[in-house]
UniProtKB/Swiss-Prot annotation:
Subcellular location: Virion membrane
Biological function: Envelope glycoprotein that binds to host cell entry receptors, promoting the virus entry into host cells. May trigger fusion with host membrane, by recruiting the fusion machinery composed of gB and gH/gL.
Membrane topology category: Single-pass type I membrane protein
Name the UniProt record assigns to this protein: Envelope glycoprotein D
Gene that this sequence comes from: MDV094
Organism domain of life: Viruses
Main location: virion
Length: 403
């Protein structure tokens, strides 16, 4: 009897352990989803439209990308230079060039409505990488910028979208715990009724956090400026999100979950601003000794001498699906920018980290499977032994005959 007693206690222990593991696994997955995180602790990019918002139209954006060189001499702002030192918080990119003056001039001319576009790029050596793009239509000049009846999806570079979002003013780019590889020249392009407002900001990341996301920089995604003649978001595999505030909350919760400095209000004062650079700094930044390697008959020169300040074929807010088929240009030889010698190590470490996570997950699943198999086997054996014991102890029926 003692043997069966101990076996029963052991079986109950195995069953309770198995149930605890299953419950913990379910709670862990549910907690990640509730916090807006994936299994690798990276933020989830919300792509669903907010319910009941009839003003959001995905058809407004025709996926056309303007050129980062869209500029005029009338709004040649200085290049702001900021240094990021708060290693586990947010980097705020807010260059010069406020659209409120353009809206004021439209209001003085008696115009009550306007259309607009906001785009962010990171510039390389004679190339540009689109980060963010959003269009607005039927906006009011009496309201702050971005107060519109129609808004397109916010189109994001997938890698930047994991740790970045656009501020509530629709203008500032916020990056959570940036790594050193994100240092560089960024440009923001605002187009209001065809009038461009282009401004640059130079970001220098001096200190990074241990969990800063690496592997965001990719030279293949930095396209030569001739790409933007017919370039679309489809050629770049950009992701569209219709819930910017949910996107913002997911990035903030991700930073707080992994130990970053979560601030209720993200302000620009966290950045150290040094002396501004002239607007001509962009031209010197573009030039590279390797530019001539990519000049051929079929490809427009990547140097700034052969690039005009037109819109590169961009005609503003249109809704012509037939234009989607007019973008056959795909970069065959990407412009290789000058990068640090240590830039390859973050990619390798990221790959090793992901492999380690996969191996750990497989080991945990195998252990859980073994627990389930062992517990099920013991349960079957116990049931079988109970049946045998019951059959042995059951009294046999004897036939009694009358005397």
């Amino acid at each position: 009897m003692n043997r069966y007693r101990y076996e029963s206690i052991f079986f109950r222990y195995i069953s309770s352990t198995r149930m605890i593991l299953i419950i913990c696994l379910l709670l862990g997955i549910g907690d990640m989803s509730a916090m807006g995180l994936k299994k690798d602790n990276s933020p989830i990019i919300p792509t669903l439209h907010p319910k009941g918002n009839e003003n959001l139209r995905a058809t407004l954006n025709e996926y056309k990308i303007p050129s980062p060189l869209f500029d005029t001499l009338d709004n040649s702002y200085e290049t702001k230079h900021v240094i990021y030192t708060d290693n586990c918080s947010f980097a705020v990119l807010n260059p010069f060039g406020d659209p409120k003056y353009t809206l004021l001039s439209l209001l003085l001319m008696g115009r009550r409505k306007y259309d607009a576009l906001v785009a962010w790029f990171v510039l390389g050596r004679a190339c540009g990488r689109p980060i963010y793009l959003r269009e607005y239509a039927n906006c009011s000049t009496n309201e702050p910028f971005g107060t519109c009846k129609l808004k397109s999806l916010g189109w994001w570079d997938r890698r930047y979208a994991m740790t970045s979002y656009i501020d509530r003013d629709e203008l500032k780019l916020i990056i959570a715990a940036p790594s050193r590889e994100l240092s560089g020249l960024y440009t923001r392009l605002i187009i209001i009724n065809g009038e461009p407002i282009s401004s640059d900001i130079l970001l220098t990341v001096k200190e990074t956090c241990s969990f800063s996301r690496r592997g965001i920089k990719d030279n293949k995604l930095c396209k030569p400026f001739s790409f933007f003649v017919n370039g679309t978001t489809r050629l770049l595999d950009m992701v569209g999100t219709g819930t910017p505030r949910a996107h913002e909350e997911n990035v903030k919760q991700w930073l707080e979950r992994i130990g970053g400095k979560h601030l209720p209000i993200v302000v620009e004062t966290s950045m150290q601003q040094v002396s501004n650079l002239p607007r001509s700094f962009r031209d010197s930044y573009f030039k590279s000794p390797d530019d001539d390697k990519y000049d051929d008959v079929k490809m427009t020169s990547a140097t700034t001498n052969n690039i005009t300040t037109s819109v590169d074929g961009y005609t503003g807010l249109t809704n012509r699906p037939e234009d989607f088929e007019k973008a056959p240009y795909i970069t065959k030889r990407p412009i290789i920018s000058v990068e640090e010698a240590s830039s390859q190590s973050p990619k390798i470490s990221t790959e090793k980290k992901s492999r380690t996570q996969i191996i750990i997950s497989l080991v945990v699943l195998c252990v859980m499977f073994c627990f389930i198999v062992i517990g099920s086997g013991i349960w079957i054996l116990r049931k079988h032994r109970k049946t045998v014991m019951y059959d042995r102890r059951r009294p046999s029926r004897r036939a009694y005959s009358r005397l």
